[in-house]
Amino acid sequence: LISAFDAADADDNVRAIIVTGAGRAFCAGADLSEGGKTFDRAARPDRKSAPLRPNGEVEWSDDAVRDGGGRVTLRIFKSLKPVIGAINGAAVGIGVTMQLPMDIRIASADARFGFVFARRGITPEAASSWFLPRLVGLQTALEWCMTGRIFGAPEALARGLVRSVHEPQDLLPAARALAREIADHSAPVSV
C-alpha cells in the first residue's frame, strides 16, 4: 500500500484514490495464529535495529521501530491526493484503523467494524487513539475501544465514522462518482 500511495502521489493524472478490499472483506486484521509472535519485532524477517539519538535513547519516530500498520496509516494521512475508503465488508483491527486517516469513508450495508484490541489484550494501533476521537467524539471512541464489539454500517453512519451506506453493488460506483466529482470540480492544487 505504501508503494501504491507513493506512485499515486507522484502521478499528476491521479486526482483521487479509492481504497477498497478484495472479496468479502475490507481487511479482517492481523493474522493472530502465531500468538505472541505476531507482534514480536525480533521474530520479523524485515526487522531492523532501532536507531539511536546522540544521547543514546531510541529514536521512536523512525520507520525502523514503527509497526507496519502504523507506517501504512501514516502514509495514507500524508497522501497528497484525496483518499476515499470504500468499506466493502469486515474491517477489524488494522482494517478499521487504516481507514481512519482517509479523507472520506463510505460503506457497504454489509460492512462490519471492530476496534477489537481490548478483547485481544493489545493496545490500539496505527494512531487510532488519535484519529478516532477526532472523527466520532471521545465518548464513542472510548466505547468502541473499551468494549471491542463489532458493529454494523448503520451505527458507523450514525456515529460519523462513515459518510454514507450503500447496497453492496452500489458501493464502488458511489466511490467512483465521488472521486469523479472531486476531480472534475476541484483544482489539483486546492485539494
Predicted regions located by residue number:
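Crotonase-fold acyl-CoA enzyme core
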Residues: 74-188
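C-terminal capping/lid region of NAD(P)-dependent oxidoreductase domains
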Residues: 15, 190-191
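Glycine- (often His-adjacent) and acidic-residue-rich active-site loop
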Residues: 21-75, 91, 121
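Short, contiguous strand/loop micro-motifs
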Residues: 9, 59-60, 139-141
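Conserved CoA-thioester-binding segment of acyl-CoA-metabolizing enzymes
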Residues: 1-24, 37-38
